[in-house]
């Protein structure tokens, strides 16, 4: 009886875990976001060949975040990270108008994968500090997010270097994880 009570309490009050896959085109700011969340500071980054993985503790949730490189040659490897992913963070460089269609195509290709059918989608419209950045509404339109009828999604304006918007995104993820468990 005591064990059952302890398990019930830990389910209610214990730390939840969430596996997050963070992807996007190269130079969108994925690694900067990861280490801003993990360390609270800006780190010097180089293009990610392969992946970085860190655990980010936030609001009683342990987010295991896999940051996977976004160069076109290694995007086919993204699918190797899909299994058991509960949340997908897709990072977009809001200032890169020339590649937003490419970003849309990669996002929709990924979302068609069966292994990601239950994953919630958080889009970080990053680099909002730049003067010509597209706002969240424009990114929503250009990525075709309204067409995702069977997918639970949210878009958050962010600036990885200042940290603006990052924790609001994690709030959305944590609330949606709580609703799914």
Curated annotation (Swiss-Prot):
- Name the keywords, alphabetized: ER-Golgi transport, Golgi apparatus, GTP-binding, Hydrolase, Lipoprotein, Myristate, Nucleotide-binding, Protein transport, Transport
Name this protein carries in UniProt: ADP-ribosylation factor 1
Its main subcellular localisation, reduced to a broad class, is Golgi
Subcellular location(s) of the protein: Golgi apparatus
Q: What does this protein do?
A: GTP-binding protein involved in protein trafficking; may modulate vesicle budding and uncoating within the Golgi apparatus.
Q: Which Pfam families match?
A: Arf
Instruction: Give the domain of life.
Output: Eukaryota
Can you state which reaction this protein catalyses?
GTP + H2O = GDP + phosphate + H(+)
Tell me its EC number(s), please. 3.6.5.2
**GO biological process annotation, one example:** vesicle-mediated transport
**CDD domains documented for this protein:** Arf1_5_like
Q: Which organism is it from?
A: Chlamydomonas reinhardtii (Chlamydomonas smithii)
Annotated GO molecular function terms are: GTP binding; GTPase activity
Q: Where is the lipid attached (N-myristoyl glycine)?
A: 2
* Annotated positions binding GTP: 24-31, 67-71, 126-129
An annotated GO cellular component of this protein is: Golgi apparatus
Mark the transmembrane ranges.
none
Family the UniProt entry places it in: Belongs to the small GTPase superfamily. Arf family.
Cited InterPro entries: Arf1-5-like, P-loop_NTPase, Small_GTP-bd, Small_GTPase_ARF, Small_GTPase_ARF/SAR
């Amino acid at each position: 009886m005591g064990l059952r009570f302890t398990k019930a309490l830990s389910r209610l009050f214990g730390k939840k875990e969430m596996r997050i896959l963070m992807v996007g085109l190269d130079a969108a700011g994925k690694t900067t976001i990861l280490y801003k969340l993990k360390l609270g500071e800006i780190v010097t980054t180089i293009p990610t060949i392969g992946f970085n993985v860190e655990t980010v503790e936030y609001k009683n949730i342990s987010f295991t975040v896999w940051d996977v490189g976004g160069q076109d040659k290694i995007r086919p490897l993204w699918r190797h990270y899909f299994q058991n992913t509960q949340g997908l963070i897709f990072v977009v460089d809001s200032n890169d108008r020339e590649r937003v269609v490419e970003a849309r195509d990669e996002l929709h290709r990924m979302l068609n994968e069966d292994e990601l059918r239950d994953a919630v989608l958080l889009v970080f419209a990053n680099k909002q500090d730049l003067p010509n950045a597209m706002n969240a509404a424009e990114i929503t339109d250009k990525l075709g997010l309204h067409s995702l009828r069977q997918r639970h999604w949210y878009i958050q304006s962010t600036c990885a270097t200042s940290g603006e918007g990052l924790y609001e995104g994690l709030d959305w993820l944590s609330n949606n994880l709580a609703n799914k468990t």
